[in-house]
């Protein structure tokens, strides 16, 4: 498990050198899975920000705070230029994925289309598939991508009132699913942080910056405290799910992904 805060210290290393460091993450708001890492390339690309898909990640070097990717610097330099300061459309995603020969993650029943893990998806020769123009033309404009930076600070509302705000995200570095939202309750419960799985979200108002969860404030108050500086253990996760009386995610990990109820305005 990794937090988005820790990932922001990671360097992205290509086969022929460093690409830059992680600036923030993009996730889709239907399955709450990280789809891209927004990379600050520093000076070698004139300050250009580029996107890196988990499809390309081959190793996590924990001690070195580094993610190794199966790409070259030239590939990244020649990749479609996406303005990361504006919403990323599905057409932009299709152009990006097509350039690298990656499949569409939205084209199957699992988190990564035909596979549960991005590492289990084969890279294809884009030239052997249908033309990019045809592929892009069939895609909708909205890709449901949100950045961790933009959603941090959203208010969290329980069934009976506000309980805190989004302070971070805990990410599974194998599936790249967001396992937990880190909730800072210090304005209501001084000094305490707790975790809430995205599956328990009942709705999000993107215009009002609010996340509604199907929990009571009392349930959150009595939940096991979360310490972001202590490594996540299965024992802690078990205590969390036992407290809430809900089945853990690992009991249905291999099942086809079904979008969480995240309708909002």
Predicted regions and their residues:
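Peripheral interaction segments used for macromolecular assembly
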Residues: 1-265
């Amino acid at each position: 498990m990794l937090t988005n805060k820790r990932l922001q210290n990671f360097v992205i290393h290509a086969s022929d050198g460093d690409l830059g460091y992680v600036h923030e993450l993009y996730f889709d708001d239907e399955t709450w899975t990280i789809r891209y890492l927004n990379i600050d390339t520093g000076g070698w690309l004139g300050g250009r920000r580029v996107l890196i898909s988990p499809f390309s990640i081959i190793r996590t070097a924990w001690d070195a705070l580094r993610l190794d990717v199966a790409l070259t610097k030239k590939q990244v330099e020649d990749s479609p230029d996406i303005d990361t300061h504006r919403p990323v459309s599905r057409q932009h995603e299709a152009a990006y994925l097509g350039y690298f020969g990656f499949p569409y993650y939205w084209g199957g029943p699992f988190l990564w289309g035909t596979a549960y893990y991005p590492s289990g998806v084969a890279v294809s020769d884009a030239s052997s598939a249908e033309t990019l123009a045809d592929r892009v033309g069939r895609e909708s404009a909205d890709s449901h991508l949100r950045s961790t930076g933009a959603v941090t600070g959203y208010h969290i509302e329980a069934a009976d009132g506000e309980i805190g705000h989004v302070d971070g995200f805990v990410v599974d570095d194998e599936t790249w699913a967001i396992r937990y939202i880190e909730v800072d309750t210090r304005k209501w419960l001084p000094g305490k942080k707790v975790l809430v799985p995205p599956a328990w979200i009942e709705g999000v108002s993107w215009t009002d910056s609010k996340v509604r969860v199907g929990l009571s404030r009392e349930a959150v108050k009595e939940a096991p405290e979360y310490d972001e500086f202590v490594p996540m253990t299965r024992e802690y996760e078990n205590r969390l799910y036992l407290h809430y009386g809900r089945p853990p995610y690992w009991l249905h990990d291999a099942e086809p992904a079904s979008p969480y109820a995240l309708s909002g305005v």
